[in-house]
UniProtKB/Swiss-Prot annotation:
Bilayer-crossing regions: 8-28
UniProt feature coiled coil, ranges: none
Family annotation (InterPro entries): PSII_PsbX, PSII_PsbX_type_1_subfam
Membrane topology: Single-pass membrane protein
Protein name per the record: Photosystem II reaction center protein X
Gene assigned in the entry: psbX
Keyword Glycoprotein assigned: no
Keyword Transmembrane helix: yes
Assigned GO CC terms: photosystem II; plasma membrane-derived thylakoid membrane
Major location (coarse): membrane
Subcellular localization: Cellular thylakoid membrane
Function, in words: Involved in the binding and/or turnover of quinones at the Q(B) site of photosystem II (PSII). PSII is a light-driven water plastoquinone oxidoreductase, using light energy to abstract electrons from H(2)O, generating a proton gradient subsequently used for ATP formation.
Amino acid sequence: MTPSLANFLWSLVAGAVVLGALFGAIIFVSQRDKVRRR
């Protein structure tokens, strides 16, 4: 595995983690909003 390939894979992993956290936060907030509105 070349260093550039390793860096590319790590950037993919970091991007997936950031996207996952973002979607998790959006879903969490939307669930809370639903409860508060009712």
